[in-house]
């Protein structure tokens, strides 16, 4: 499968058309951004690491009944995917208080939530991806109420599966972001699942092992990403 034309370039990936109108190639970059593109840099080998992790996790989710855009891994940086009409709603699932949940509501960082919190955000960098509810999403024409309920149900299912997966690898899945899209009338999980889109803390030490190391200049960014890759790919 060959790349024919650049369809879209985002902060972390490029998406290329192929000779099959239903399939695209997602190429992972080493570029890193934070705070809605206000901070920019690179993380060595990030594209390779995130592609490997995402391929493994999409395969795991598919084996447990979750419909995703993933088709196959093509190379170190390239993933073959079903072409999606992206729904401009970011679904965030929170298991432990961190990030904007702490800033917005005053939770103590690290507070374990009794039940996961599922949030919806408008996918719009110019507006700083604002928090919204279902009524906003419907009014904006992004999805209907039935579709939004499906997104939340899928997010809850994915959360249960991933929490179990990562706990077995001594990682606390603090929170994570999901994106979905439409493909031939079906809603599929898209984008990626990686230290770019998830917060991971070591279960024993609480050490941050995700893009927060880049956001807040904690150092050891490449080592943290590589360690997550090791635990995801190499541990049973």
UniProtKB/Swiss-Prot annotation:
Transmembrane segments: none annotated. InterPro entries: SAICAR_synt/ADE2_N, SAICAR_synt_PurC, SAICAR_synth, SAICAR_synthetase, SAICAR_synthetase_CS. The keyword Nucleotide-binding applies. Keywords: ATP-binding, Ligase, Nucleotide-binding, Purine biosynthesis. GO terms for biological process: 'de novo' IMP biosynthetic process; cobalamin biosynthetic process. Pathway: Purine metabolism; IMP biosynthesis via de novo pathway; 5-amino-1-(5-phospho-D-ribosyl)imidazole-4-carboxamide from 5-amino-1-(5-phospho-D-ribosyl)imidazole-4-carboxylate: step 1/2. Its EC number is 6.3.2.6. Disulfide bonds: none annotated. CDD domains: SAICAR_synt_PurC. One of its GO terms (molecular function) is ATP binding. PROSITE patterns: SAICAR_SYNTHETASE_1, SAICAR_SYNTHETASE_2. It catalyses: 5-amino-1-(5-phospho-D-ribosyl)imidazole-4-carboxylate + L-aspartate + ATP = (2S)-2-[5-amino-1-(5-phospho-beta-D-ribosyl)imidazole-4-carboxamido]succinate + ADP + phosphate + 2 H(+). Belongs to the SAICAR synthetase family. HAMAP family: SAICAR_synth (MF_00137). PANTHER family: MULTIFUNCTIONAL PROTEIN ADE2, SI:DKEY-6E2.2. NCBIfam families: purC (TIGR00081). This is Phosphoribosylaminoimidazole-succinocarboxamide synthase. The gene is purC.
């Amino acid at each position: 499968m060959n790349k024919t034309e650049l369809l879209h370039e985002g902060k972390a990936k490029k998406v290329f058309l192929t000779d099959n109108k239903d399939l695209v190639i997602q190429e992972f970059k080493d570029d890193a951004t934070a705070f809605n593109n206000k901070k920019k840099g690179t993380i060595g080998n990030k594209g390779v690491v995130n592609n490997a992790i995402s391929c493994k996790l999409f395969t795991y989710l598919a084996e447990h009944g979750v419909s995703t855009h993933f088709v196959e891994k093509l190379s170190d940086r390239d993933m073959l995917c079903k072409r999606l009409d992206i729904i401009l709603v970011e679904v965030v699932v929170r298991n432990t208080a961190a990030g904007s949940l702490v800033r917005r509501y005053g939770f103590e960082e690290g507070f374990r939530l009794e039940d996961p919190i599922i949030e919806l955000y408008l996918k719009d960098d110019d507006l700083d991806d604002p928090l919204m509810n279902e009524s906003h999403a419907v009014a904006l024409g992004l999805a209907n109420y039935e579709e939004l309920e499906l997104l939340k149900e899928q997010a809850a299912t994915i959360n249960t599966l991933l929490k179990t997966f990562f706990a077995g690898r001594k990682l606390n899945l603090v929170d994570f972001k999901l994106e979905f899209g439409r493909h031939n009338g079906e809603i599929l999980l898209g984008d990626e699942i990686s230290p770019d889109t998830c917060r991971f803390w070591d279960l024993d030490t609480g050490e941050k092992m995700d893009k927060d190391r880049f956001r807040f200049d904690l150092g050891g960014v490449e080592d943290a990403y590589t360690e997550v890759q090791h635990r995801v790919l190499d541990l049973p």
